[in-house]
From Swiss-Prot:
This protein's record includes keyword Mitochondrion: no
Enzyme Commission numbers on file: 6.3.2.9
Compartments where found: Cytoplasm
Record pathway: Cell wall biogenesis; peptidoglycan biosynthesis
Record GO cellular component, one term: cytoplasm
Chief localisation class: cytoplasm
Catalysis performed (reactions): UDP-N-acetyl-alpha-D-muramoyl-L-alanine + D-glutamate + ATP = UDP-N-acetyl-alpha-D-muramoyl-L-alanyl-D-glutamate + ADP + phosphate + H(+)
Listed Gene3D superfamilies: Mur ligase, C-terminal domain, Mur-like, catalytic domain, NAD(P)-binding Rossmann-like Domain
Stated family: Belongs to the MurCDEF family.
Classification via InterPro entries: Mur-like_cat_sf (IPR036565), Mur_ligase_C (IPR004101), Mur_ligase_C_dom_sf (IPR036615), Mur_ligase_cen (IPR013221), MurD (IPR005762)
Protein name in UniProt: UDP-N-acetylmuramoylalanine--D-glutamate ligase
Amino acid sequence: MHDRLIDENPTCGFVRLGLDVRSRVIVLGLGATGLSTVRFLRCHGFECAVMDSRLAPPGLQDLREAFPDVPLFLGDFSRSALAAATHLVVSPGLSLDLAEIRESHRCGVRVFGDLDLFACCVRAPVVAITGANGKSTVTTLVGLMAKAAGVNAAVGGNLGTPMLDLLDAAAELYVLELSSFQLERSELFEADVATVLNISPDHMDRYPDLASYAEAKRRVFRGEGLMVLNQDDPLVAAMYRPGRRAVRFGLGSGDELDYSLARWEGRAWLLAKGVPLLPADEVRIKGRHNLANALAAVAIADACGFDRQAMVGVLRTFPGLDHRMQWVADIGGVAYVNDSKATNVGACIAALSGLEGKVVLIAGGDGKGADFSSLVPVAAEKLRAAVLMGRDGPLIDEVLKGVVPTIRVKTMFEAVRAARGVAQSGDTVLLAPACASLDQYEDYQERGRDFAATVRSLA
């Protein structure tokens, strides 16, 4: 909720972006983020135009109804409009390497994203959460812990509500999930508490190598806020800057860990600064990777001063997010689990590692340029078979062939039917695609719903 206009707030930080009422702003890319950006700019007295390479981008009808006077450029980018702009607010779905964006930047146009607009106006502490995997779960956990502790927290960003729509004078805390794409185009944002949960290859179609992807994630640690570091991940641990305040979490029990998993009175417990918090088997979300997520959430919640009993209550009751290790059905002694959000190799490995017994894996889709070879060790240990679909299913097949039996299919119906045919009592059929969904589906949610509906139809 944007409750002030720029002329009513002389201390507003738009000057940091060189923005004033004479600025010629183009919002590049519509969708949820672009629409929220237009709403924010207009509320604060700025004129803007919208440009999108798609003829019918998401949010178009809402934009036309709410702001019929905003100029629209759909289809090919308008070079003349770009040449006249002073500022480009680029939505995260667009690569900064696009020729038109590079040319604008070369000509002195200020290029940034919604995160820097947020940084100009935020007036309450901010928690920033990023990582290859687990960030939505940790963001949700921290938001629920804040609520349980009686803190008015606004939760969103890359998850749910766009961050500019969260801005509200009543908010006592902001909890943001941030993607590498949001971070890479920010120069101003600094969080009070920030974490990188883990680094594994993702979006390799947008980054030349893993180091570049990790560098984009590292930007969440700009400023002097508290660093929450996953000590089990060497790439994350190496992000520590001497002199910065930091706490560390991990699934080991080393002295360097502030938040850890350790045995106490014969059980595995989550420890917070050496104090037993709750038994690991009482954390409702299952999987070893989710214990790491729980520790990260506790570390952040501690930094925010939340009551620990509030944290424990959330960990005992939070069932997890849809399409993330979500139980669908037990049929003939076989469990069917939907982890459609496992859109990269690291997430697939984490899902497999957290399951007991043999697994029939359904994988494939848009691999985003990933190297699937790191699947081999866990596949050899865990898989009874792999059922492969989608555009890059053949690439996974090439990697796993000779390691485990593989089956190639075209549709989710064929995939579930094939998996049911090879699964044995006590096995798990797991949808953990290691790929994005856009080659066959609108998004990972639609893919997960298709899996769940197909499983139930075959019951």
